[in-house]
């Protein structure tokens, strides 16, 4: 597929009409030249006015598309996969529809990605005003990160930039049969194939929030499911050719 942009933001949407405004405002505020990126909203058959709100609030100068699914999938995996397949960006970045990002995320992220030919760019993030897992973000900027030394296994959330070519060539997609922590499986698989990984932790770039309303990706899990997620992740890394010391 033709590459037209440096990066594509992929936003899965389901019944977010009352919560999506901060997300769109943060997209509108991005400092990266608008000709260099696009936004792909994938609506998972919302029953409210989410699509109308997006069309009303999004800056008309932004390259954006809305993919409308006719049948709801019930999780974020299928919409994200559609976004990956439709992307025209050299990189993809995943953003949940009720979260928001710093205005410099795209600009700083793509700069370090292009500089280092990064396969993955990690961003420092906050969850409900609490910094998530500080260890990988000990240093403000890391051009070439190491999985073990930089504790990258401690944060497998998918709120990162991923090189689209790496995902497509290795058929890295979200497992649609997994309803919780699907991002951990995706993140672990991407780590298996990533040769260059960079970290941006000079500021908080991604702001995640939790709400009681229905959400595509933030669901509770049983301890049994959590165990299977970690087991699969560790097994995948052990079976790979990566020299990783699990301590």
Residue ranges and their predicted role:
Residues 1-246:
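Nucleotide-sugar donor-binding/catalytic module of glycosyltransferases
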């Amino acid at each position: 597929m033709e590459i037209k942009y440096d990066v594509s933001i992929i936003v899965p949407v389901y019944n977010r009409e009352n919560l999506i405004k901060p997300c769109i405002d943060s997209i509108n505020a991005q400092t990266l030249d608008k000709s260099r990126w696009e936004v792909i909203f994938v609506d998972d058959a919302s029953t409210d006015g989410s699509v109308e709100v997006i069309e009303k609030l999004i800056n008309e100068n932004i390259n954006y598309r809305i993919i409308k699914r006719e049948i709801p999938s019930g999780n974020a995996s299928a919409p994200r996969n559609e976004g990956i397949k439709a992307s025209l960006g050299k990189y993809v970045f995943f953003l949940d529809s009720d979260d928001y990002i710093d205005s410099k995320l795209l600009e700083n992220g793509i700069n370090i990605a292009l500089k280092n030919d990064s396969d993955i760019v990690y961003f420092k993030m906050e969850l409900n005003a609490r910094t998530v897992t500080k260890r990988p973000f000990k240093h403000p900027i890391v051009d070439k990160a190491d999985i073990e030394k930089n504790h990258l296994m401690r944060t497998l959330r998918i709120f990162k930039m991923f090189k689209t070519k790496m995902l497509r060539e290795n058929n890295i997609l979200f497992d649609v049969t997994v309803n919780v922590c699907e991002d951990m499986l995706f993140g672990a698989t991407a780590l298996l194939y990533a040769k260059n990984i960079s970290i941006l932790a000079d500021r908080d770039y991604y702001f995640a929030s939790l709400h009681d309303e229905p959400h595509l990706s933030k669901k509770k899990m049983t301890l049994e499911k959590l165990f299977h997620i970690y087991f699969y992740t560790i097994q995948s890394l052990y079976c790979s050719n990566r020299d990783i010391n699990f301590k």
